[in-house]
Amino acid sequence: ARFDIYDNPDWAKGYDIVIHDECSADVKEMPYVQRILDAHKAGVPAINLHCAMHCYRTGTNDWFEYLGLQSSGHGPQKPIDIAFVAPEHPVVKGFA
């Protein structure tokens, strides 16, 4: 899936945070992906949900470097340990 909002270089202007939940594994156009990444490189934080982990397989590592991991497929479906590095941050405050 492609989203028209990402055609605008200023797509993230005015947002405090972006939640990525798109499922766009077949989108490979680097200018499009780079516009998404540029907003985050400029400081707009993001939360990336499940599908976003599998997106933008452009043949580069750009998306996966942004995520901090490379997801090439589903492994065993087991509980995932989560550690909150900033437990008082407003995004996660009160989470356990």
Where are the language model's segments positioned?
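Structural motif
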Residues: 16-21
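A glycine-rich, often tryptophan-bearing local segment used as a flexible ligand/cofactor-contacting loop or short
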Residues: 25-95
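Aromatic-Pro/Gly-enriched surface loop or interdomain linker
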Residues: 1-15
